[in-house]
Design a protein with these regions (language model features):
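Right-handed parallel beta-helix
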Residues: 202, 207-231, 266-373, 379
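Acidic/polar low-complexity surface segments
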Residues: 150-174, 238, 243-246, 266-296, ...
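Beta-solenoid repeat scaffold
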Residues: 59-66, 116-117, 128-151, 229-231, ...
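Short glycine/acidic-rich loop motifs that flank beta-strands on beta-rich extracellular proteins
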Residues: 128-130, 148-152, 274-280, 317-323, ...
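Acidic Gly/Asp/Thr-rich repetitive segments characteristic of extracellular carbohydrate-active
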Residues: 14-34, 91-121, 125, 193-201
Length: 700
């Protein structure tokens, strides 16, 4: 590594000479030039072209010339050394466009520790893929274009084969500890083999073993962490509060890392080597294997801390424009990607990917016709805001997480398709505490093992070019939806880690006929509060856990009733119009209706409240509600099968009929229908008995 001299701020007695160009400087004889002679070069190729510099003669220097910071006049000994204030400039290497590759100049400046900032003032071309271990450096391309046509071939499956790849050093040896005691969630004190090896301020790659019985890559912890305190001989504190609990006997592996730090890349327009080439994977002309070798992308970081990227605008890149793995504390802002060669090849066509990353902020980014705008894999405590992906109906979803135990991720003010933890069981399909606010899209899928999912002001709008159903799929494990809208709502249950209630409030949905809203595995309470449902026709709740509707508006099409298999169905307040509520009696069930609820209209079953002939006993608890039938043949209550324990008091019925079959109140069944108000109601009920009391009502 060659270290150039910084221009001294103190006055010098050495006279400063002047020459028009670098060529004239190098053509001048140097045999009699005194040591320390300063020369002001007015331009690189022509005076005033921006490539001018001040150089100093060092008669003892033997460093190889690099056409910029070290100028070789052709002598065995003696070099002109560029003086600078820590800022490097490609023009001072004679580069003013894309005619010549800028790779050698880039290497010279990055590998010079005296240079802390590198600037581009023209378009540039790079023909090689560069790997650096370098910190405290800023590269600013000034909004100019970088091209890479004909760049050297990449290696197989290598998203780190970027033009700029900054990588920290990872030790070759690791230390593993078997936990003697459980490691609780939110712990920042970790058990280690010997804390004497862990100095305060050192960085470590920390990995858990594979989840017992889990998938091949299923690990809850893979992060780059810094030691903040030595607690005792076998414990240290890290700068991270653990997102997942570990039982005693689980293993943690620690590998020391010397990260690259404070490297920032800014303001570049990047044209991928295969930009504009048709994707053979899509059109059937062949597999896209060749593209991973010939394609190009600008930036990759690995084992990096506080390395930021901003103002990168790429077209036609193969691997992610900004690729990160094992990164902690970073920002990616005001970047974009247009038209990558593929959206169907896994790992390709991304704007930014983060693997094993922590404390990241991705903001003000755009993607067009890409696979992903942002992918968070095995990452935590990251914020994605004001990012927008268009062209997402062609095969890519702008926002995704892998499902490799991500936790505490927040998305705010974004738009574009979004799915969570959806990459497959090999990685665990698990995530925790994902919060999404103010998001617009035409498809949302979060139906895997996602715990404590929070959605606020999220809107799924059906779009004929991608998902006409406007799908909204979520997991009932601490689920909280507030102020959301969608079309097809599907709620499942793939995990049961949370103690938080499942609540959908102030939301609106309009599912197609026959939609299964509550799936079979849901065995916990599910509450809908102040929600609006439109187009109800044959909807199904197959779940077994209780379901509550509080002050909800349900509008039907006078089609098939909504069927429920839930153990408890509780209706408090609200309005149900042209829709029937029918219990399947597949198990013992309880229906509670009250709180001023209103049922009104008719439906295909000609019954507003009814049951099927399943083997379960249905307990009916009806009070303080109103039922208005719009046709004389529509029943407010139709109970004609199975075992029933019926109680209705304080209700109001208008028009229609009430139909009870004697067989539905045999054996241990009973009915108490009393102190109600009935107006123009036709009764079809058996005579009263010691188990059937239908008197003491006010009838008109």
């Amino acid at each position: 590594m060659t270290r150039t001299r910084l221009l001294a701020s103190t006055a010098s007695a050495v006279p400063v000479r002047s020459v028009p160009t670098v060529g004239q400087l190098l053509a001048a004889p140097v045999a009699a030039v005194p040591a320390g002679t300063l020369v002001k070069v007015l331009g690189y190729h022509t005076a005033g072209d921006g490539g001018g510099m001040t150089v100093r003669w060092d008669p003892r220097a033997t460093a190889p010339g690099n056409c910029g910071t070290v100028l070789d006049p052709g002598s065995a000994v003696g070099r002109w050394l560029q003086l600078h204030d820590g800022v490097g400039d490609f023009r001072r290497f004679g580069l003013f466009g894309t005619a010549e590759a800028a790779d050698d100049a880039l290497d010279a400046m990055v590998n010079d520790p005296a240079i802390r900032r590198i600037e581009a003032h023209t378009d540039l071309r790079f023909a090689r893929r560069h790997t650096y271990f370098r910190s405290e450096l800023e590269l600013d391309f000034g909004g100019h274009t970088v091209v890479t046509k004909g760049i050297e071939r990449n290696t197989h499956d290598n998203p780190f084969g970027a033009v700029l790849y900054f990588r920290g050093n990872r030790a070759e040896t690791s230390a593993t500890v078997t936990l003697a005691a459980p490691l609780a969630e939110l712990s920042d004190v970790f058990e280690v083999p010997d804390s004497a090896a862990f100095g305060v301020g050192t960085w470590w790659a920390v990995e858990s073993d594979v989840v017992p019985g889990g998938g091949r890559y299923e690990r809850e912890l893979q992060k780059l962490l810094q030691v903040t305190e030595i607690v005792d001989a076998t414990h240290v504190r890290f700068n991270y509060q653990n997102g997942w609990a570990f039982a005693a006997g689980r293993k943690l592996t620690y590998t020391k890392v010397e990260p690259v730090t404070q490297v920032h890349v800014r303001n570049m327009v990047f044209i991928g080597a295969d930009a504009g080439v048709k994707d053979p994977y899509v059109d059937g002309s062949g597999a896209p294997d060749e593209f991973e070798y010939t394609g190009s992308h600008p930036i990759a970081f690995e084992y990096a801390v506080r390395c930021d990227v901003s103002g990168i605008h790429a077209t036609g890149t193969w691997w992610p424009v900004i690729m990160r793995r094992w990164c902690t504390h970073f920002r990616t802002t005001q970047c974009s990607l247009k038209n990558p060669p593929t959206v169907f090849y896994g790992g390709a066509g991304y704007l930014t990917q983060q693997i094993y990353c922590l404390y990241g902020h991705i903001a003000d980014c755009l993607s067009s016709n890409a696979r992903h705008l942002n992918d968070l894999t095995a990452s935590a405590h990251c914020l994605v805001e004001n990012c927008h992906g268009d062209g997402d109906d062609t095969g890519g979803n702008p926002f995704t997480t892998h499902g490799q135990y991500e936790h505490d991720l927040t998305f705010v003010g974004n738009s574009g398709l979004l799915d969570i933890a959806n990459s497959g069981s090999l990685w665990g399909t698990s995530a925790k505490r994902i919060t999404i606010r103010k998001h617009r899209m035409s498809w949302f899928v979060a139906l895997t093992k996602i715990t404590d999912l929070t959605l606020e002001d999220v809107h799924v709008t059906a779009r004929s070019t991608f998902d006409p159903g406007g799908t909204f799929q979520v997991n009932a494990d601490g689920l909280q939806l507030r102020g959301c809208t969608g079309v097809t709502l599907n709620i499942g249950r793939r995990s049961g880690r949370s103690s938080r209630p499942n609540l959908v409030s102030d939301c609106s949905f309009a599912a197609p006929p026959g939609t299964t809203i509550g799936q079979t595995p849901i065995d916990v309470p599910l509450t809908f509060r102040r929600c609006t449902f439109s187009g109800a026709d044959g909807w199904v709740f197959n779940s077994s856990g209780p379901v509550h509707f509080e002050d909800c508006i349900v509008r039907g099409t006078a089609g098939a009733p909504i069927t429920f298999k839930n153990s408890d169905v509780v209706i408090t307040g609200g309005r149900w119009t042209d829709v029937g509520l029918q219990l399947t009696a597949v198990r013992d069930q309880r229906l509670h209706v009250g709180g001023g609820a209103l049922f009104k209209g008719t439906n295909q079953a000609k019954a507003l409240l009814s049951r099927q002939g399943g083997p379960g006993t249905v307990t009916w608890e009806l009070n303080s509600y109103t039922s208005v039938a719009s046709a004389g043949d529509t029943a407010h209550l139709l109970i004609d099968a199975g075992g029933n324990r019926f109680r209705c008091t304080g209700a109001t019925f208008d028009g229609g009929r009430i139909a009870f079959a004697a067989a539905a109140f045999a054996d241990s069944s009973y009915a108490l229908h009393s102190r109600n108000v009935e107006t123009a109601v036709t009764r079809d009920v058996p005579a009263g008995s010691d188990r059937l009391s239908v008197g003491d009502n006010l009838t008109f």
